[in-house]
Every structure is written in structure tokens, then in C-alpha cells.
């Protein structure tokens, strides 16, 4: 008699999803899937709106990575009005650096939330710890000083975002061709020196290093478990800049294989020539893949692990030192170990802090050349924007009619890019923890969630559960009859 186990909902991720695992008569895993059960429809909602509303409208997809959607939309609008990089015209240095400042501040803030609030509980307490302990409240009780540092670190990132975009959430600064405001000297000094109850930028870097050391300690104690947990091969993809390394704001899309050979590299405006999307009836989320390789061989991994696989170096000294250690661990090959995503995420927190410090010292942020006026007859009616969001490569593609109203929108978000590899991760973990015995335990079910949480999936808006998980496990026979159900 086959069995069907349901983990519904998956907790401590952004949004709502469930996991379904199918077992055969011998309790071997037949299949395992991540079901995304929410339908948002923002691509349809934005149609008919004026094109200039897109960055403000579509950033409301998420309360966590809204800066990425805002900037991705702004870059697409740069294209539409004829001042985008596709036309060979660049926004002013002040505009680009202001956008980059806010982007890296969000990288720091978002990764801090994911790493410390959602992932560290498993690192400190273990997968088998009681649900009431395995969350941020448990962290407060076990290590209040750590939580205080994390709160201050996240606050600092939020304040930089506010200074750049005008609001802590759903900003208003980026416009077609540039930005509305620069950064004042008073604001700059506030972040550099730690005024008004904020950390200084050097303290931020110190705290980021503490986070990296936390992973090193965890890895040293649990090396075998961490390394063997869902080692799932996949292609890796991210934006690379003119220096041939990861660029979080602009570049070419590069895809590499397990030997770090370049499989494809292309201008992101041509993404439709290279990628297709599969659809499954059991999920509202699509499955992108490289056309020439097909769905099974052409799926990609994006996000911290994908970026650290693709890039050869990082332009900041402390993060570069950490990256060298990361690369040395796999002896030059691609790192496919799912839980090493958290290692990569910790490196990116440090890198973002260092980049923000460099940008704060850049005098271009105080200049007043903010918006580039489009040349005559420059309107193209179509634009594509791509950035590296915290969770991975994010793409916005818009078309508008002669009145400037949007007629088409396609959003390829990082979690969608990771959809296939997340499902493979679920299958791998299910085989290790469920196959052959079928015993349902708290630690076993949470192990599947741990695998998903490593990708920090943003399924819709920010939804985090505290305390005991509202988890339901249902067992069905081959005829689809419910024969057992457990809830807590």
C-alpha cells in the first residue's frame, strides 16, 4: 500500500507552501514535491497601469526583497525611455551608485534576516530540537547578546535603505533614467560613524564577521552531516560584470557546470532566446530551464551558492579571504552542498557591508546629477531589467503601448529559478530521512524544511511562524483514501 505524507505548511519561509512525499509499499520514496499553493498574479495586475508605476507597484510583491523588484523595474524603465544600457547610454554615476548603495544595504538586511532569524536556530539547537525552541524566541533565551547584535545589524541596513529610497519599505527614489535624491553628508556620516543609536559601518563589518565565524564553528562540529545533506548537482548562474566576476546590479548572465566550465553566457535582454518555462498542475510556480539542455539538464541554481560558485573573486578584502576558503573546500569544483548555501550567504553579508562602506566614502553620492534626460524619439516601449536579488537572479520584462500603459509583464524571480533544484533537494532529503522506514518524526519532517529554507524561498509576502509549527501529516493509500493523519 503506497503512502502519502504531507507537510503543510512549510514554516519559516516567505509565503505558503507544502511538501508532499509519496512512499511505496516498502516505505521507499517514490516522489517528493514542493507544492506552491498561493497565486499572486502581479503580472496581470500591472497591465493597464502607466509604465512609470511599475517599480512602485511591483515591489509590493514582497516585503522582504522589495528593493530588488524596485531596482529591476527601474532598470527596465531605463530601457523603455531610451537611457538603459541596451541603448548604450548609462544613467549618471550618482544615480547608479545610489541604486547600488540601496541594493547592497538590502542584501545585508535580507540575508541577516534569513541567516540569523530563520536558519541559525537549526545551527544552534539542531533539527531535532523542540519547535518551541527552534526559532528566534529560542535564540533570545539562549543567546540574547547575539540577537541584540542581529537586531542592530538589520536596523542599520534598514536605515540605509530608508536614506536611499525614502522609505524603509517600498521605496520611491528610482525613476526612469535615474533617481530623485542623493545622499547628504549628514546621512553619510550617520552611517559611517554610528550616530543616533546606529552601529558604525566598522561595527557592521565586525558583526558580519561574527556571523561567518558562527557557520565555521557549526561546520566544524557537524561537518559530515552538513556536507552530506542534499548534495544536489545543478548548473549555477549569476550576473557577471566587466571584471568577469559577480556583479549584483548589472552584467551578463553566466551559467557554469560542475567543472566550472562556462555553459552559456549572454546579454540578459536575450533571455527568451535561451530560457523556457515548464508548468505543472500541482504548483503555481513555473520551472525555468535552459532550452538547449532541456528541463532535467538545463535547470539552474541561483542565489548565494550559485553566485559564489560562478565568481572567481570578490572586490573586498575580507569577503575575498572568505571566498578563497570557500572555493578551496571543493578543490576548484562547483559546490552543490545545499547547507553550504548558508556559508555563501554569510560571505555575502560581509561583502555587502564592505561594499556599502566603500560607497559611503564615494563623493559621487553627494553630486546633483540625478536623472538623465532621454534623447529625442528615444522611447522604445519595451524594457528588461535584471539584478542579483538576495535569493538570486531576478528579471523584469515590460512592454507598453503608445500611451505608455503596460501591455505585458513577465517576472522571473529567484525562487522560480531555483524551483527545480529545490524539488530535487526535497527528494534527496526525503530519501535520506524517510526511505526504508517511513517513521514520521519531528526532526525528519523539519529536515525537509531545512533543505527548502536553505534557498530562503520567497513564495509571496513575508510570513514567518514562531513556536510550534501548524504542521499536518496525512497518509493516503494507493486509492487515495486517508488512512492516517497526525497534527500538532
Swiss-Prot record:
<dbReference type="InterPro" id="IPR029014">
    <property type="entry name" value="NiFe-Hase_large"/>
</dbReference>
<keyword id="KW-0533">Nickel</keyword>
<comment type="subunit">
    <text>Tetramer of an alpha and a gamma subunits (flavin-containing dimer), and a delta and a nickel-containing beta subunits (hydrogenase dimer).</text>
</comment>
<keyword id="KW-0479">Metal-binding</keyword>
<dbReference type="InterPro" id="IPR018194">
    <property type="entry name" value="Ni-dep_hyd_lsu_Ni_BS"/>
</dbReference>
<dbReference type="GO" id="GO:0005737">
    <property type="term" value="C:cytoplasm"/>
</dbReference>
<dbReference type="InterPro" id="IPR001501">
    <property type="entry name" value="Ni-dep_hyd_lsu"/>
</dbReference>
<dbReference type="GO" id="GO:0016151">
    <property type="term" value="F:nickel cation binding"/>
</dbReference>
<keyword id="KW-0614">Plasmid</keyword>
<protein>
    <recommendedName>
        <fullName>NAD-reducing hydrogenase HoxS subunit beta</fullName>
        <ecNumber>1.12.1.2</ecNumber>
    </recommendedName>
</protein>
<keyword id="KW-0963">Cytoplasm</keyword>
<feature type="binding site">
    <location>
        <position position="62"/>
    </location>
    <ligand>
        <name>Ni(2+)</name>
    </ligand>
</feature>
<feature type="binding site">
    <location>
        <position position="458"/>
    </location>
    <ligand>
        <name>Ni(2+)</name>
    </ligand>
</feature>
<comment type="similarity">
    <text>Belongs to the [NiFe]/[NiFeSe] hydrogenase large subunit family.</text>
</comment>
<feature type="binding site">
    <location>
        <position position="65"/>
    </location>
    <ligand>
        <name>Ni(2+)</name>
    </ligand>
</feature>
<keyword id="KW-0560">Oxidoreductase</keyword>
<dbReference type="GO" id="GO:0047985">
    <property type="term" value="F:hydrogen dehydrogenase activity"/>
</dbReference>
<keyword id="KW-0520">NAD</keyword>
<feature type="binding site">
    <location>
        <position position="461"/>
    </location>
    <ligand>
        <name>Ni(2+)</name>
    </ligand>
</feature>
<dbReference type="GO" id="GO:0008901">
    <property type="term" value="F:ferredoxin hydrogenase activity"/>
</dbReference>
<dbReference type="Pfam" id="PF00374">
    <property type="entry name" value="NiFeSe_Hases"/>
</dbReference>
Amino acid at each position: 500500500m503506497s503512502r502519502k505524507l504531507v507537510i503543510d505548511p512549510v514554516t519559516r519561509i516567505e509565503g505558503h507552501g507544502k511538501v508532499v512525499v509519496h512512499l511505496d509499499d516498502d516505505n521507499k520514496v517514490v516522489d517528493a514535491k514542493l507544492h506552491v499553493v498561493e497565486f499572486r498574479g502581479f503580472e496581470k495586475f500591472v497591465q493597464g497601469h502607466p509604465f512609470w508605476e511599475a517599480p512602485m507597484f511591483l515591489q509590493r510583491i514582497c516585503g522582504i526583497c522589495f528593493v530588488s523588484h524596485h531596482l529591476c523595474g527601474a532598470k527596465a524603465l531605463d530601457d523603455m525611455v531610451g537611457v538603459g544600457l541596451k541603448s548604450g547610454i548609462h544613467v549618471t554615476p550618482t544615480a547608479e551608485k545610489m541604486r547600488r548603495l540601496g541594493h547592497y544595504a538590502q542584501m545585508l538586511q535580507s540575508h541577516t534576516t534569513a541567516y540569523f532569524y530563520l536558519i541559525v536556530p537549526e545551527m544552534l539547537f539542531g533539527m531535532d530540537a523542540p519547535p518551541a525552541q527552534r526559532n528566534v524566541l529560542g535564540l533570545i533565551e539562549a543567546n540574547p547578546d547575539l540577537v541584540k547584535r542581529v537586531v542592530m545589524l538589520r536596523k542599520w541596513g534598514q536605515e540605509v535603505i530608508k536614506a536611499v529610497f525614502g522609505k524603509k519599505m517600498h521605496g520611491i527614489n528610482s525613476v526612469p533614467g535615474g533617481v530623485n535624491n542623493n545622499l547628504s553628508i549628514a546621512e553619510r556620516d550617520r552611517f559611517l560613524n554610528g550616530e543616533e543609536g546606529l552601529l558604525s559601518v566598522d561595527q557592521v563589518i565586525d558583526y558580519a564577521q561574527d556571523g561567518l565565524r558562527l557557520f565555521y564553528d557549526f561546520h566544524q562540529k557537524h561537518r559530515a552531516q552538513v556536507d552530506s545533506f542534499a548534495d544536489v548537482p545543478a548548473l549555477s548562474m549569476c550576473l557577471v560584470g566587466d571584471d568577469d566576476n559577480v556583479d549584483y546590479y548589472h552584467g551578463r548572465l553566466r551559467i557554469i557546470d560542475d567543472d566550472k566550465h562556462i555553459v552559456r553566457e549572454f546579454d540578459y535582454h536575450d533571455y527568451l532566446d535561451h530560457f523556457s518555462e515548464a508548468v505543472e498542475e500541482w504548483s503555481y510556480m513555473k520551472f525555468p530551464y535552459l532550452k538547449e539542455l532541456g528541463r532535467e539538464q538545463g535547470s539552474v541554481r541561483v542565489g548565494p551558492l550559485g553566485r559564489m560558485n560562478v565568481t572567481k573573486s570578490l572586490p573586498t578584502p575580507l569577503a575575498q579571504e572568505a571566498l578563497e576558503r570557500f572555493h578551496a573546500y571543493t578543490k576548484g569544483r562547483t559546490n552543490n552542498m545545499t547547507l553550504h548555501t548558508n556559508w555563501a550567504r554569510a560571505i555575502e553579508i560581509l561583502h555587502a557591508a564592505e561594499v556599502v562602506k566603500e560607497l559611503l566614502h564615494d563623493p559621487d553620492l553627494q553630486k546633483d546629477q540625478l536623472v538623465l534626460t532621454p534623447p529625442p524619439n528615444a522611447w522604445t516601449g519595451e524594457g528588461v531589467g535584471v539584478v542579483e536579488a538576495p535569493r538570486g537572479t531576478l528579471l523584469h520584462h515590460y512592454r507598453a503601448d503608445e500611451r505608455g500603459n503596460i501591455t505585458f509583464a513577465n517576472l522571473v524571480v529567484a525562487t522560480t529559478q531555483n524551483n527545480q533544484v529545490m524539488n530535487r533537494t526535497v527528494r534527496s532529503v526525503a530519501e535520506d530521512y524517510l526511505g526504508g522506514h517511513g517513521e514520521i518524526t519531528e526532526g525528519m519532517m523539519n529536515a525537509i524544511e531545512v533543505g527548502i529554507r536553505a534557498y530562503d524561498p520567497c513564495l509571496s509576502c513575508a510570513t514567518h511562524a514562531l513556536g510550534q509549527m501548524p504542521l499536518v501529516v496525512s497518509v493516503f493509500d494507493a486509492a487515495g483514501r486517508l488512512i492516517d493523519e497526525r497534527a500538532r
